[in-house]
Amino acid sequence: RRVSDPEVIKSWCENIELDSRLPLLALHEGKVVAISSLLQNKGGWKRHIGRISQSILPKYRQKGIAGKLVQELVDVARMAGLQKVEAEFIDKQEGGQKLFALLGFTHLLRLEDYVQDMQAINHDYVLMGMDLKTDEEYAGMG
């Protein structure tokens, strides 16, 4: 499913499962220009890890929108008690990797020619992640 497809976004909005997928949208003149999502597995060996995915229209890149959406989702993940967040990229998504690095993510893994794009061209798979630390000042406050 292509996250830039308006029908995919519409389906997500109509079937929101906030306990496992939290989407944040950026709108301009009533049009979705960016979407970021925090995905969480409620069971299994990755239940403590959230995954952030993002898509932003090229015209709206380099304007600070993506960084604000990602930072908001990192904060939500921390408040939800997740211990880590991760993000997946292909090698040519260098701008996204740089943004996530600026926000505190580190490169965890790179698998050469592991994934294919929509045109069946092989790319390196890149996994970035961040450990979420609880602010000691607020720990234990309910």
Regions found by a protein language model. Name each.
Residues R2-K59, D131-K133:
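Acetyl-CoA-dependent GNAT
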Residues E7, E94-G95:
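Short alpha-helical
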Residues L18, H48, G81, N122-D124:
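Residue-level preference for beta-strand/loop junctions
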Residues G50, D113-G142:
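C-terminal "cap" of GNAT-fold acetyltransferases
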Residues R51, G95, L102:
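Amphipathic alpha-helical recognition patches that constitute DNA-binding helices
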Residues Y60, G64-E72:
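Conserved acetyl-CoA pyrophosphate-binding loop and the N-cap/start of the following alpha-helix
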Residues V70, A77-F89, L99:
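Conserved GNAT acetyl-CoA-binding A-motif
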Residues E86-F89, A101-H123:
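Conserved catalytic-core motifs of GNAT/GCN5-like acyltransferases
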